[in-house]
């Protein structure tokens, strides 16, 4: 299967803030018309984030053939969920997900409670023929006893209600191969995020091999402290085995999209996207 490529709009967040119309048109000009939103103001807003209004979104989707193939929601709560899903369905989006979660070290009961919550969200989405997905960072690969949090989430969540969007970069940063995860849980993944890791990064690829203790209590302040812009690279410019990742993802039965997500760009955001897109064109099993 040739994998369709899209983009998580967080990759161009600063460009969107300055010129949303110009940015979305620039992405469409590159052929990037499959977009994933990131609504970080879900307490008060229903859309795809970045200040993009519903009217403008409808207009540019119609004029440029853009489709919204997913949207991360933060904060994620049951009270606002029906209203948010109403909006997403109106724009033709059938997937919503969480963007970031933290788990107090060793607290298995907390993991279970969050898994139960994800099942509830997934059930509400499924009642509308929509999907709920879980997006990871590195902290899900911390071991709580003999299993990682990610393994526990796979175990505690209902496969029919909770899908997964694997951020392959962050899996490596947690010391786990995304290829192994694809092979271990082939039915669970519907999308993935792709970026790269520079060869000259100041710290090891696996954060647990250097700056992070195995028993660290990871929260947002620590995450932000560990997030180093110099440790991100455009697709095809670093050391990650991206063709192998693509090949593994292409074999998954429920997998739909590989999304470029550049947490930090080496230069201007749209130039960064162009660099990654040109790299994607050189890989096999890719559909632009």
Regions flagged by a language model, labelled:
Residues 35-59:
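Glycine-rich, proline-tolerant flexible connector loops at the mouths of alpha/beta enzymes
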Residues 17-18, 45-51, 143-144:
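Conserved glycine-rich "GG(E/T)P / GGGxP" loop and the immediately following alpha-helix
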Residues 11-13, 39-41, 74-77, 102-104, ...:
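Active-site-proximal loop/turn and secondary-structure-junction residues that shape catalytic pockets
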Residues 1-33, 62, 89-92, 147-166, ...:
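Histidine-acidic metal/acid-base catalytic patches
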Residues 16, 50, 76-77, 114, ...:
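Charged, low-complexity surface patches
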Residues 25, 34, 63, 67-164, ...:
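Active-site acidic/histidine proton-transfer and metal-coordination neighborhood
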Residues 12-13, 46-47, 74, 110-111, ...:
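A generic secondary-structure micro-motif detector
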């Amino acid at each position: 299967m040739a994998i369709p490529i899209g983009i998580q709009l967080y990759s161009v967040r600063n460009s969107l803030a300055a010129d949303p119309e110009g940015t979305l048109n620039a992405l469409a000009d590159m052929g990037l018309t499959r977009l994933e939103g990131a609504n970080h103001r879900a307490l008060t807003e229903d859309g795809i984030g970045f200040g993009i209004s519903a009217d403008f979104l409808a207009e540019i989707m119609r004029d440029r053939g853009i489709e919204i193939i997913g949207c991360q929601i933060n904060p994620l709560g049951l009270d606002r969920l029906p209203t948010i899903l109403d909006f997403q369905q109106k724009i033709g989006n059938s997937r919503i997900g969480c963007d970031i979660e933290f788990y107090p070290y060793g607290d298995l009961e907390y993991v279970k409670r969050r898994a139960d919550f994800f099942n509830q969200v997934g059930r509400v989405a499924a009642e509308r023929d929509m999907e709920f997905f879980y997006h990871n960072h590195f902290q899900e690969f911390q071991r709580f006893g003999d299993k990682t949090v990610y393994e526990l989430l796979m175990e505690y969540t209902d496969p029919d209600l909770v899908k997964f969007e694997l951020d392959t970069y962050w899996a490596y940063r947690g010391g786990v191969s995304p290829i192994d995860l694809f092979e271990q849980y082939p039915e669970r993944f519907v999308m993935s995020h792709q970026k790269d890791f520079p060869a000259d990064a100041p710290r090891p690829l696996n954060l647990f091999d250097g700056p992070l203790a195995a028993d660290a209590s990871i929260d947002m302040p620590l995450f932000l402290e560990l997030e180093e812009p110099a440790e991100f690279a455009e697709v095809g410019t670093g050391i990650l085995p991206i063709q192998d990742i693509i090949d593994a993802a292409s074999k998954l039965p429920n997998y739909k999209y590989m999304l470029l997500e550049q947490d930090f760009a080496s230069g201007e955001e749209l130039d960064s996207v162009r660099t990654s897109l040109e790299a994607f064109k050189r890989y096999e099993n890719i559909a632009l």
